[in-house]
């Protein structure tokens, strides 16, 4: 039975958690109040999403291990996104496999979409249409489809999103859903078939291993701040190696990445804390910010409100 969900998010943590089939660890890197819209459409075999985000962000993506698919820009004139440090322009799509983590970075506000099938369905459709499988289990890479194929994919994806928002009852009808699904799957396959691609499997294997160790270290210290000396020691790499890896995959130095991580940890702590029992100064110090004035200015610039306002609000209460 087809299902549809259209949602708006102001909390990036909830937004990342709401992207189904992918485990996402990420945070916003732009300044201001976050807002994102998500349209999810589950057809018979095909799952698709449409996303509209107003601030740049970095996401480390862990696939579910059951579905492979593609992502692409929905707007023809928007800044390029990056997948594993490789630019994916509005004339390309990125395809991702079943079991390899990858990074997705936006440089500004963006609209992007995804489509996915199970490995078995992907293999069956690829064999039926072209005689071979089109997405491997570990592959993540950029593809440059023919302009006509990509245009058709975008148009069908947009039409499905429009139906989901305006007349969802029609899209939920099995015969309509099946027809749209067939058109979308066919369009996706023609984008993937025989398209030149930039293969990331054999590029920078050493840096990919460093990034996996970096993320494992961050995961092991998910609720506490890390500093450069500790990070380099636990990852087993020099600062310069970490810097090169982070610049390629994340678009920023490891020092900046750790600073942003500490800021987001402090934001989470402020939102969860009881203002009667703790202070902004205590929370800031817990996460390595000892100059309260500088912290307050940076916090307001990054999140659009003062840390004292975040603390006074009841836990999990929405912003007004």
What spans do the regions from the language model cover?
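Generic hydrophobic, amphipathic alpha-helix propensity
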Residues: 210-214, 258-263
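N-terminal low-complexity or simple alpha-helical regulatory segments
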Residues: 1-66, 70-72
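Well-ordered mid-protein domain cores that form the structural environment of catalytic cofactors
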Residues: 47-49, 55-102
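C-terminal structural cap/anchor segments
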Residues: 237, 247, 256-259
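Short, conserved glycine- and acidic-residue-centered signature motifs
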Residues: 63, 207, 259
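Conserved glycine-rich phosphate/nucleotide-binding loop
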Residues: 285, 297, 303
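Alpha-helical bundle regulatory/interaction domains
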Residues: 1-33, 79-222, 227-229, 233-239, ...
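Short hydrophobic/aromatic patch on the recognition helix
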Residues: 242, 246, 294-295, 299
């Amino acid at each position: 039975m087809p299902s549809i969900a259209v949602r708006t998010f102001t909390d990036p943590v909830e937004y990342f958690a709401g992207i189904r089939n992918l485990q996402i660890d990420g945070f916003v890197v732009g300044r201001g109040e976050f807002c994102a819209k998500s349209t999810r459409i589950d057809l018979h075999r095909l799952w698709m999403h449409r996303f509209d985000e107003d601030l740049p962000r970095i996401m480390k993506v862990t696939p579910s291990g059951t579905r492979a698919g593609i992502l692409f820009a929905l707007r023809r004139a928007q800044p390029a996104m990056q997948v594993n440090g490789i630019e994916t322009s509005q004339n390309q799509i990125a395809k991702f496999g079943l079991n390899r983590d990858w990074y997705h970075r936006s440089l500004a506000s963006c609209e992007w979409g995804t489509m996915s099938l199970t490995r078995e369905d992907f293999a069956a459709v690829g064999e039926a249409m072209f005689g071979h499988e089109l997405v491997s289990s570990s592959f993540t890479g950029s593809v440059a489809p023919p302009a006509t194929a990509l245009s058709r994919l975008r148009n069908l994806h947009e039409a499905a999103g429009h139906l989901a928002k305006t007349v969802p009852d029609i899209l939920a009808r099995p015969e309509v859903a099946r027809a749209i699904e067939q058109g979308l799957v066919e369009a996706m396959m023609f984008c993937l078939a025989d398209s030149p691609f930039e293969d990331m499997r054999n590029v920078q294997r050493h840096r990919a291993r460093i990034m996996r160790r970096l993320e494992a270290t961050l995961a092991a210290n998910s609720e506490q701040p890390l500093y450069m000396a500790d990070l380099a020691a636990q990852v087993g790499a020099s600062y310069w190696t970490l810097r090169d890896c982070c610049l390629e995959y994340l678009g920023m130095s490891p020092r900046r990445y750790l600073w942003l991580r500490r800021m987001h940890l402090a934001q989470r702590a402020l939102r969860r804390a009881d203002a009667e029992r703790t202070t902004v100064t205590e929370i800031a110090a817990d996460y390595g910010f000892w100059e309260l004035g500088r912290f307050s200015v940076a916090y307001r610039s990054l999140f659009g409100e003062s840390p004292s306002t975040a603390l006074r609000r009841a836990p999990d209460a929405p912003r007004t």
